Amino acid sequence: QNLLKNLKYDKPITMLDLMNHQAGFEDYPLYIGSDKDLGALMKKTPSQIYEPRTVTSYSNYGTALAGYIVERVSGQSFADYVHEHIFQPLGMEHTALKPDLSDNRYVQKQREKEKTYDTEGNLLKGDVPFVLGEYPAGRATGTFFDLKRFAQALLQKKTLFKRAETWENFYSASHTYPGTDVPVNAHGLWATEFENTRTLGHGGNSPGFTTSLLLDLKSGIGSVVTVNQRNEFHFAIAMPDLIYGRKKEASKASQRDFQAGFYREARIFSKGPLSIFRVFKSTSYLDNPSENAAIKDYFGFWTAGEKGGSYRLNLPISDRMKLSLLDVIKDYGSLVLAGLALLYVALCYLCGILAKLYRLLLRKNKGSNSAVWSIWHYLTGSIILWVF
């Protein structure tokens, strides 16, 4: 109660919305500390920029919020609950979950020894272990063999749930592509369509490290991929294709009817300094998503159409919203103006320094008008920097 302060919509957020990443939250900075008090961490609420159940936008905050709900319902810390109900029953003796990894001394020590490499296989020195503040949303750290045990338990449908119907419900679609019965998400597991099968799974990424877990329930085959090399996405994407076959593409009709234009990922920072990334990182021109390397290799299948008054590309992880020409002009125009403003500030300070050196060398005093003019430039420059 009174936990979420920045809710824009009256529609309640459900646990299923959090699993489907459809609570409507903007993206949130990951480097926010390692506070062990999850309740205090959850009070740092990101803005709600979409109405619940209308847009898929991956949210670490939403996942952490689900973990906090588990704490409130169970009366245990999230880490203790997971140890008791998952790690211990499955014999996962080398996996930790707390922000400082103090719940497993072995993992805590081994984590300090981890190394990551560049694309040429050279050791990257000076890397500091990545800390994700919202620890239920990715802080789990353990060995490959523990992750394999977890994957086997999920694939064999044993130990974790007592009733068979719970397993069936867990693996059923909780969110589908609009107008189809093709699943996007199954209670937190992302669906990937291959030509001859379908997988459910999830991945995790931090600088230099990637982990992927996929389950093919139809054939009873699963895969776990862990990589500690930069550009690791190539391994995480390509290796499953060797196991499950080619990814299924969107229908010919979807590709034919797709509306080309500028699209923006729904997962964005809506305000603050990081919002600038939505212009040049999260926005791109799409003619046919099936010809876009990132979409084709990572997702394969997609649909598109009108929803809620806007045309969008429907994908796992993050939908992509089509932008109007006016939106594009405003965004890139703002970026140009911001660049000019920063250039103005740089020139003001540079000219000021050069002028001082000139007067110092020639022993000339500046007049009162020059002093007022300098103060005006410095004040304007300081205001611009403060805004940014």
Regions found by a protein language model. Give the residues of each.
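Short, well-ordered beta-strand elements
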Residues: 202, 212-228, 312-315
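A short acidic/small-residue loop/turn micro-motif
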Residues: 131, 230-232
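Electropositive phosphate-/nucleotide-binding environments in soluble metabolic enzymes
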Residues: 141-144, 233, 237
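Peripheral terminal and inter-domain segments
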Residues: 197, 234-388
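Short, surface-exposed loop or secondary-structure junction motifs
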Residues: 3-217
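Residue-level signal for short, function-critical loop segments
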Residues: 69, 228-229
